[in-house]
């Protein structure tokens, strides 16, 4: 945070930017190059054996309200150390975020923390601000799912999105299954004990750590051989030689022997095609086929990949190889005229790209004031704009009273001839 921030911004303090992910939350201030904190999106309750995830879509509203209230209190008063009444808020959200969740979140911010204004910004659109481009095919590989959404001339093409339940959660489930089936543990009492006899289930934090420290994505040729050996359709396919085994310490006394075959096979579930021939790579191609034909070439040459799962070693190289391999198949070859695919390299780690875009947008204070939902408007109506709602109020009603609109906004809303 700048030492003299009040002098250069007309007295208005920089906005708070929150990227509320299902696994981790990124939080910081607009105009900065990185978040102040990246913390698990969980809270701990007395008497509960496990931490409670804050981002849940299948619980009642009042329970969700209490979780969000406690979690955001931690963000403001343990990590950011600022008064929430003094600063606008930019919330990075998914376009598929359920309405009841975003309404509960804004109710917490306006009614409990009394923030001046809130802007709900799509994560896919914010990612493009870090690159200075206005058209791209954006793939977000997160914890629960992988979601692809084309952005053309700054407008999300909402009828061309695609999603699959392939992300960090699926990797953790597959990793736990293989570890419990194949791996052994050395303890102080005995050697080479089966893992289920020592611990019935593996905590999520340990699975995350094993995945990050030991797992990687193989190249296309090796990956196809691993998949062929796994399914063994013809009965004579041999698996490529595995990487070295890794000894992973568990709570200081136990040593878990992670097999090399697990290290490179776990991530293959992202690229294995299911019964409907769907994978992370086909998500991009299928979305591209739904786009207007005159936009496909530009979108194919501007791929942007964000999300923590995409940070696995070798992921981007494999994704590009998979796309180039699949585009030669009859399903796509006759429809997609382009064969050129390029992936951008954003100026931040993949898990922080959307947050950085929100920090850039939040630093434009005139634009931020004209696009945010003000506290006065929310207190009068109790509503927030929603792209999937047909009865949104006029845009002029949502902005701060007395706030001068920038020239582009004046032209957009002007009724003068």
Curated annotation (Swiss-Prot):
It holds the Pfam family Actin. SMART domains: ACTIN. Gene3D superfamilies: 3.30.420.40, Actin, Chain A, domain 4 (3.90.640.10). The keyword Amino-acid biosynthesis does not apply. GO terms for cellular component: axon cytoplasm; dynactin complex. It comes from the Eukaryota. It is found in: Cytoplasm, Cytoskeleton. Keywords: Cytoplasm, Cytoskeleton. One of its GO terms (biological process) is retrograde axonal transport of mitochondrion. Subunit of dynactin, a multiprotein complex part of a tripartite complex with dynein and a adapter, such as BICDL1, BICD2 or HOOK3. The dynactin complex is built around ACTR1A/ACTB filament and consists of an actin-related filament composed of a shoulder domain, a pointed end and a barbed end. Its length is defined by its flexible shoulder domain. The soulder is composed of 2 DCTN1 subunits, 4 DCTN2 and 2 DCTN3. The 4 DCNT2 (via N-terminus) bind the ACTR1A filament and act as molecular rulers to determine the length. The pointed end is important for binding dynein-dynactin cargo adapters. Belongs to the actin family. Part of the dynactin complex that activates the molecular motor dynein for ultra-processive transport along microtubules. This is Actin-related protein 10. The gene is ACTR10.
């Amino acid at each position: 945070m700048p030492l003299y921030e009040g002098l250069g911004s007309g007295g208005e303090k920089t906005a708070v930017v929150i990227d509320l992910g299902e696994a981790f939350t990124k939080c910081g201030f607009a105009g900065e190059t990185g978040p102040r904190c990246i913390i698990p999106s969980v809270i701990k309750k007395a008497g509960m054996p496990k931490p409670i995830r804050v981002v849940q879509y299948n619980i009642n509203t009042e329970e969700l309200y209490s979780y969000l209230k406690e979690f955001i209190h931690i963000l403001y008063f343990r990590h950011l150390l600022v008064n929430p009444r003094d600063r606008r808020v930019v919330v990075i959200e998914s376009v598929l975020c359920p309405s009841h969740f975003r309404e509960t979140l804004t109710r917490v911010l306006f009614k409990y923390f009394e923030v001046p204004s809130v802007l709900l910004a799509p994560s896919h659109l914010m990612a493009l601000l870090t690159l200075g481009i206005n058209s791209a095919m954006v793939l977000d590989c997160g914890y629960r799912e992988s979601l692809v959404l084309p952005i053309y001339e700054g407008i999300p093409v909402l009828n061309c999105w695609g999603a699959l339940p392939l992300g960090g959660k699926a990797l953790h489930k597959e990793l736990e299954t293989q570890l419990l089936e194949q791996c052994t543990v050395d303890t102080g009492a005995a050697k080479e004990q089966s893992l289920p006899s020592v611990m019935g289930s593996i905590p999520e934090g340990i699975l995350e750590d094993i995945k990050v420290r030991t797992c990687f994505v193989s190249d296309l040729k090796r990956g196809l051989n691993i998949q062929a050996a796994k399914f063994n359709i013809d009965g004579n396919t041999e698996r490529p030689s595995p990487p070295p085994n890794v000894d992973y310490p568990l709570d200081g006394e136990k040593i878990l022997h992670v097999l090399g075959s697990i290290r490179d096979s776990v991530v293959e579930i992202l690229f294995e095609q299911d019964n409907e021939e769907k994978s992370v790579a086909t998500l991009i191609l299928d979305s591209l086929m739904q786009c207007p034909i005159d936009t496909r070439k530009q979108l194919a040459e501007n791929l942007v990949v964000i999300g923590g799962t995409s940070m696995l070693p070798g992921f981007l190289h494999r994704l590009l190889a998979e796309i180039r391999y699949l585009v030669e198949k009859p399903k796509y070859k006759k429809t997609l005229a382009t064969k050129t695919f390029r992936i951008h390299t954003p100026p931040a780690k993949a898990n922080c790209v959307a947050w950085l875009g929100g920090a850039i947008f939040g630093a434009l204070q005139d634009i931020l004031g004209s696009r945010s939902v003000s506290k006065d408007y929310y207190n009068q109506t109790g509503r927030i704009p929603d792209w999937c709602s047909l009865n949104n109020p006029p845009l002029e009603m949502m902005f701060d009273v007395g706030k001068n609109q920038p020239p582009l906004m004046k032209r957009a809303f002007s009724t003068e001839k």
